[in-house]
Regions:
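A compositional/structural signature for long, glycine/proline-rich flexible linkers
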Residues: 23-350
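Bacterial N-terminal signal peptides that target proteins for export
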Residues: 2-9
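Bacterial N-terminal signal peptides
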Residues: 10-17
């Protein structure tokens, strides 16, 4: 995006955030600060309608009908466990897996104090002041009583193995009080705040969207990150690159064909890359007869120089093809990323 346009957007955002209403608590700034908590509570309460606190639920491979989170990755088995440690710590035990497997711990402010890749010891989750039992644990401290353990296990034509391993992902404890307050705002404030958040999405660096503790990232960046991809994680574990336009700056549409070049060297040993496409209208996977929603290190053929060529088109034909069929955007992900990797693809409209 042109630097001048970015500057105009940031000036507009600043002016809107500083605009006050008659109620000092019913402001755009207060709404944006509260937005991550709102979204976490909304997701938690929806999940609790069908699942039990402190118990894991696994999705299997996500398809376009799954609206649990926006911008999900397709070839991953997700595990969810909303819990409360109001009455004492909880312990998560996990199996060994020879491919990518991560355990992310979220609080209700969308802080992620820990993302542990292929854990080698039990994970103990606690609040400040709670006593740690004897044992060798990876200790994680939360800022809120309630939280989420979110697991990602990459699936490479081995769903049966993944499903069997998931039986060994368990929590001891986590069955405290699940009540969590949410601040309410006027419809006018909410509408104006979302104008700001939507404007920020186009200019925020995804590497600066998520933090471990409150204050790690700007509340503006966090709100934009949560709206675009709730349950996203800090950049040392997963790095993100948005694919919103072609190289001429035009939004991506479902009628044209695009050739995407993914750069080499995005991830370190044990990691992988993925490019997933989503409908602009709902931020979910796009239904198609091929049931192909992404390409990854495991499902695409590299070029000799280590780059990857992908074809995004209505039919999904072409090298490493992904079907589109409607207005869309993409997300490039690098798991176990190289810190120096450039998370930007080349997008050529044919």
């Amino acid at each position: 995006m042109n630097k001048r346009i970015k500057s105009y957007i940031l000036i507009l955002v600043s002016l809107l955030v500083m605009t006050e209403t008659s109620n000092a608590l019913d402001t755009i700034e207060e709404y944006i600060r509260e937005f991550p908590n709102q979204e976490q509570v909304k997701m938690m309460n929806a999940w609790l309608e069908k699942n039990e606190k402190g118990m894991f639920q696994f999705t299997g491979l996500v398809d376009p009908s799954d609206a649990t989170v926006v911008t999900p990755q397709a070839t991953v088995d997700y595990g969810y466990n909303w819990f409360s440690i109001s009455d004492g710590p909880a312990i998560v035990r996990t199996p060994k897996y020879d491919k990518f497997f991560s355990v992310s711990i979220f609080d209700m402010l969308h802080n992620i104090p820990a993302v542990i890749v292929n854990p080698d010891k039990p994970i103990l989750i606690k609040r400040p002041g709670q006593k740690v039992p004897d044992g060798d644990f990876a200790v994680v401290e939360l800022e809120t009583d309630q939280g989420l353990v979110f697991t990602r296990m990459v699936v490479v034509d081995n769903m049966d193995e993944v499903r069997e391993l998931s039986k060994s992902i368990v929590m001891e404890g986590g069955k405290g009080d699940m009540n969590r307050d949410v601040q309410r705002f006027s419809a006018e404030t909410e509408k104006k705040a979302h104008v700001v958040i939507d404007a920020l999405i186009s200019v925020v660096n995804p590497d600066d969207a998520f933090g471990k503790v409150s204050g790690d990232v700007s509340f503006l960046n966090l709100a934009a990150g949560v709206k675009l991809g709730q349950l996203g994680t800090p950049s040392e574990t997963v790095r993100y690159g948005l694919i919103l336009t072609d190289d001429d700056g035009a939004p991506l549409n479902g009628k044209d064909t695009y050739i995407i070049t993914v750069p080499a060297g995005l991830y370190k040993e044990g990691g992988y890359y993925s490019v997933t496409v989503y409908g602009t209208d709902n931020k979910l996977l796009i239904p198609n007869d091929k049931k192909i929603y992404d390409r990854t290190t495991y499902s695409s053929e590299p070029n000799k120089d280590g780059t990857y060529t992908l074809t995004l088109s209505p039919s999904g034909e072409g090298k490493n093809g992904i079907p589109t069929g409607k207005d869309f955007y993409g997300v490039l992900r690098a798991y176990v990323p190289d810190p120096g990797a450039v998370m930007k693809v080349k997008v050529e409209k044919q």
